């Protein structure tokens, strides 16, 4: 990190001040939180497909482990919702299960973390995310998760942020 050029754009995923068990230095985290943000918006069907491909072991060899992890979520989302998820797992309705987890757990947790780390990106009264025109994060829509889509998005981001400096 000592070799970073402060005048160059650095792209980071801003989910947490922790990377595993290591903590990002406070000043670095503060600068990241104050920097310009771009939210990647991806259609749900592609998010579900990506998760199923990258975590397929939870559908095959590690179903018991998945069920254990769901148990931990009861405190956050309630017994009724976790029981619904268990039913989806038992019925092997994987697409529906993943979408439910994303909508009712992951996305909500991500928004809450974002509100803590980037409060200026949210409207104080409504709690809703501000648009770029209101001083909030920009949004970049990715129509799918193909390599060429990522490449184009990276080019667009580099061009956009090069203009900032």
Region locations from a protein language model:
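Conserved nucleotide-sensing/catalytic segment adjacent to the nucleotide-binding pocket
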Residues: 1-26
């Amino acid at each position: 990190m000592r070799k970073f050029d402060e005048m160059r754009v650095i792209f980071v995923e801003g989910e947490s001040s922790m990377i595993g068990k290591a903590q990002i230095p406070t000043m670095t985290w503060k600068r990241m939180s104050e920097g310009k943000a771009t939210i990647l918006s991806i259609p749900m069907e592609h998010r579900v497909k990506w998760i199923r491909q990258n975590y397929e072991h939870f559908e095959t060899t590690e179903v018991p482990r998945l069920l254990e992890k769901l148990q931990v979520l009861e405190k956050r989302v309630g017994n009724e919702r976790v029981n619904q998820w268990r039913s989806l797992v038992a019925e092997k309705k994987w697409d529906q299960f993943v979408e439910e987890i994303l909508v009712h757990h992951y996305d909500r947790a991500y928004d809450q973390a974002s509100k803590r780390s980037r409060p200026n990106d949210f409207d104080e009264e409504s709690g809703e995310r501000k648009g770029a025109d209101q001083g909030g994060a920009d949004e970049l829509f990715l129509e799918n998760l193909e390599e060429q889509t990522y490449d184009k998005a990276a080019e667009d981001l580099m061009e956009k942020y090069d203009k900032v400096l």
